[in-house]
Amino acid sequence: MSLCLGFRELGLQPYEPVLEAMRRFTEQRSPDSQDEIWLVEHPAVFTQGQAGKAEHLLVPGDIPVVQTDRGGQVTYHGPGQLVAYLLLDVRRLGFGVRELVSRIEQTLIELLASYGVSAAAKPDAPGVYVDGAKIASLGLRIRNGRSFHGLALNVDMDLAPFRRINPCGYAGLAMTQLRDLAGPIELDEVRTRLRGQLVKHLDYAEQTTLTGGID
């Protein structure tokens, strides 16, 4: 089946309204609905996944904490981090959860390789790593064969808030970002490259930019 993947570029948006819009989209979509990926940055926020434990929030301070329904544990979102929410009919695509995670990781690995950065996945810890430091996090939820939530790639951001938590439940996990590995980076360029890699690795025939809000 020839499928077109739609992208919405949302800019900087508060986390909770986007979370509610993702849930609403997933609940209301039909078998014929186009798959969408929402590209967004968030103001500073910690999010707790379904497996999250309070002890991994070390010193949240003035950064809000939001409980969410994605997989995984606590992570941090902030400006300069590229977040992609994958609103896909994975049943229609024919992917299992493990294959979807693997395809997302390979998307990120090839994207980073295009900047000369050698990255890898870990079989026991979803995400993408460079020399043991985490550069991208994954957290998904599948409901009725449809995915939501997605990935977060550290591009050009303040990494200090990660020290207030045990990222993804791992004490002392080092975090890194593309700017520190490849020099000054334009987020818009990374966004464009990410779109192309997602289309390739998720087996879509083409992509389009969607307009309008997510309300």
Swiss-Prot record:
Q: Which GO terms describe its molecular function?
A: lipoyl(octanoyl) transferase activity
- Database matches in Pfam families: LplA-B_cat
Kindly tell me the pathway this chain contributes to: Protein modification; protein lipoylation via endogenous pathway; protein N(6)-(lipoyl)lysine from octanoyl-[acyl-carrier-protein]: step 1/2
Per UniProt, residues of the BPL/LPL catalytic domain are 31-206
Q: Where is the signal peptide?
A: none
Enumerate the CDD domains for this protein. Answer: LipB
Biological function: Catalyzes the transfer of endogenously produced octanoic acid from octanoyl-acyl-carrier-protein onto the lipoyl domains of lipoate-dependent enzymes. Lipoyl-ACP can also act as a substrate although octanoyl-ACP is likely to be the physiological substrate.
The record's listing under NCBIfam families reads:
lipB, PRK14342.1
Name of the protein in its database record? Octanoyltransferase
- Native organism is Pseudomonas putida (strain W619)
Source organism phylogeny: Bacteria, Pseudomonadati, Pseudomonadota, Gammaproteobacteria, Pseudomonadales
